[in-house]
Amino acid sequence: MSRIAERFALLRSRGEKGLIAYLAAGDPSLATTRRLVHALAEAGVDMVELGLPFSDPLADGPVIQAASQRALAAGANTDNVLELVAALRADGLQIPLLIMTYYNLVLRPGVENFCHRAAAAGVDGLILPDVPVEESDEIRAAAGAVGLDLIQFVAPTSPPERIRRAAELARGFIYAVSSTGVTGVRDRLPPQLTAMVEAVKAVTDTPVAVGFGISRPEQVRQVTAVADAAIVGSAFVRHCGEGLPEHELVERVRILAEELKAGTRPGTGWDSRFVKNEA
């Protein structure tokens, strides 16, 4: 069982849902990212996605695009991000770590080489938003050979046959995009969210995590009333661009994580029929 599967099993045993946090690795520095990941874990975050910065991040909104540019300017690259993962594991970090990036950065060193190095460093899964399920055979095989979970995507526009195919191939969890477009904070979650998650759950037992647009505890509660986890990125990344002293940045991220994680625990009193954020 992968570390990701083990985490979801632990959450089920607690009657709890998951919180997955995204950080752009190297923003504002790799050393700060290391401290931020530990702060997230201490706050109860269940998994962390580390964005491997790419110069043309098509799926990312302005907040994460800016973070990627800051990380690139600070010198973040595949080698030192994987070194960061290895350092986090050497520190004793136990929660799952995933790399989110674009396929060009996987192809550049060779698919098998990238997957082998990622797994050796301590990465548990890969998220590649520009690799559709129909074109994922090579990377899926290479990832599976070294124990990496390749995360599959579904969206509100996904037809039933694509949902079924993603469900068949899914490992770790299925990333359900809450709305079309790019990442970023949104004031309101779409009314079709429940139907999309239920459509996925009708064809698989693989956990479903919802991302894009989630930034507040009430949105986490709304999402996890129907899904197995909420993914939060821009709300964390935004703090990294504020030029704060490191200790203040780490503390702000820790507090936000604690507030968001509280929304995944039982007894929140939210009805799964209501997925719109109240104004």
From Swiss-Prot:
Keywords: Amino-acid biosynthesis, Aromatic amino acid biosynthesis, Lyase, Tryptophan biosynthesis. Transmembrane segments: none annotated. It is an enzyme of class 4 (lyase). InterPro entries: Aldolase_TIM (IPR013785), RibuloseP-bd_barrel (IPR011060), Trp_synthase_alpha_AS (IPR018204), Trp_synthase_suA (IPR002028). It catalyses: (1S,2R)-1-C-(indol-3-yl)glycerol 3-phosphate + L-serine = D-glyceraldehyde 3-phosphate + L-tryptophan + H2O. Pathway: Amino-acid biosynthesis; L-tryptophan biosynthesis; L-tryptophan from chorismate: step 5/5. It comes from the Bacteria. Gene3D superfamilies: Aldolase class I (3.20.20.70). One of its GO terms (cellular component) is cytosol. One of its GO terms (molecular function) is tryptophan synthase activity. The active site is at E49 (proton acceptor), D60 (proton acceptor). Its EC number is 4.2.1.20. The alpha subunit is responsible for the aldol cleavage of indoleglycerol phosphate to indole and glyceraldehyde 3-phosphate. Belongs to the TrpA family. Tetramer of two alpha and two beta chains. PANTHER family: TRYPTOPHAN SYNTHASE ALPHA CHAIN, CHLOROPLASTIC (PTHR43406:SF1), TRYPTOPHAN SYNTHASE, ALPHA CHAIN (PTHR43406). This is Tryptophan synthase alpha chain. It comes from Symbiobacterium thermophilum (strain DSM 24528 / JCM 14929 / IAM 14863 / T). The lineage of its organism: Bacteria, Bacillati, Bacillota, Clostridia, Eubacteriales. The gene is trpA.
